[in-house]
């Protein structure tokens, strides 16, 4: 299985694993959503709809803020997984954040995040996690490519929806299209950081 391992310098006691699944079947997505709502511990992951995520920096910013809030007891959500989703949202409404950034049965792509204590990170734990995710998400049509900025911008993000969510339809961008992803990243992160101010 392909995944990104993120270590936060300020929080050496935790390790973040990020997986991308594409082509996940609608019944599987429906099952994931139902299990999350029921609180099934086998689904103790952060599942994200990547249509509103513009870059890895945008995703990392949300993860960092969620871990920071968790470590200092300032979480607005009940769980760290929901806090990651909430920190992607530009507005102060957890239910709206779950609706926009959580599992969407209409989107066959899914970013899956697991935050683990570094002390529990070893090859056996990664293999168990790998096997578990394959069991709950794999279908004949699903794939597990490496998550990077190119695949996010070219294949996953829906720019029209992203601009609507972050209210960027009237934003002026430089004429150089090569840095559009960078400009949108800065605006999206800024909107999240200023939420509620």
Swiss-Prot record:
This is EKC/KEOPS complex subunit CGI121. Belongs to the CGI121/TPRKB family. Component of the EKC/KEOPS complex that is required for the formation of a threonylcarbamoyl group on adenosine at position 37 (t(6)A37) in tRNAs that read codons beginning with adenine. The complex is probably involved in the transfer of the threonylcarbamoyl moiety of threonylcarbamoyl-AMP (TC-AMP) to the N6 group of A37. CGI121 acts as an allosteric effector that regulates the t(6)A activity of the complex. The EKC/KEOPS complex also promotes both telomere uncapping and telomere elongation. The complex is required for efficient recruitment of transcriptional coactivators. One of its GO terms (biological process) is tRNA threonylcarbamoyladenosine modification. The gene is CGI121. The keyword Transcription applies. Its main location: nucleus. Keywords: Activator, Chromosome, Nucleus, Telomere, Transcription, Transcription regulation, tRNA processing. Pfam families: CGI-121. SUPFAM superfamilies: PF0523-like. The keyword Nucleus applies. GO terms for cellular component: chromosome, telomeric region; cytosol; EKC/KEOPS complex; nucleus. Component of the EKC/KEOPS complex composed of at least BUD32, CGI121, GON7, KAE1 and PCC1; the whole complex dimerizes.
